[in-house]
Amino acid sequence: MAKIPLDNDQLVGETLGLADSDVDFSDTDFLVIVTPLFEKPVESGATGARGFDVDGKSNFLVVTGPYGDYFEREELDDWLLHETGHLMGLQHIYDFHRAAGAFDVMGNYIVSDTASFNDFIGWNKFFLGWLSNTQVNCLDDSVSFETFHRLTPIGKNSPDLKLILLKLSESEALGIELRHRSYLDEIKEGDEGVIIYKIDTKILDGQGMIEIVSSPSETLTDKTHGSSVLGTMSKGERYLGFGYKVEIIDSNSDSSYVSVQRQLEP
């Protein structure tokens, strides 16, 4: 989480104090404070795990940011979504050019030269409770036979399967999901497909907790940040790694059919 300086704490405290006489915050979980364009800008950020107590509401979480971050910088149109992700407990999954690519708003925070895929990656949606148990298939090494799964796009609002998780250890797993263009996903039609990524919950904020491992030669080029991994897979492609074989059996406009099988050590 970003470290909030003392001046920012003072700004939030005074703002809440002034508004408290007119606003009942008892049913509020998050608050966004938009500041004027001061000569010395207020640092943008989220309070993270440490919040404020107002109207009997403890751990009151706040995002602050200058007016320009909302309305005058097109490349920061996902800024509020990114900071709100922190309020909900998500960490940075930087650095995106070698790790999560452009597939999560917590990792592609400032990507202005290529399409930003401003949705949350499946693991983060699962963490937030946005995916039900029926939308996630979890497997571990006790499943030795080949399994088949029909994945639907992570950004499509439907009750269908969205995510496959392959447990590697107590802190590690492989995530498999389908990315298609949607309201939040600005991925180009030719770049759509299945991605596979490694999750390691022991890796600290900003150190690459999520890393795309499928099709590492597939990249996007960004003028500011260089190449970032794309990693999408289409019909007929397969991935071998971490003791698993994952193959895309078929794909259409609505779904991809994926087979998963353990690869026994020789």
Q: Where are these predicted regions, by residue range?
A:
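Extracellular hydrolytic enzyme modules, especially secreted metalloproteases
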Residues: F25, F30, F38-I187
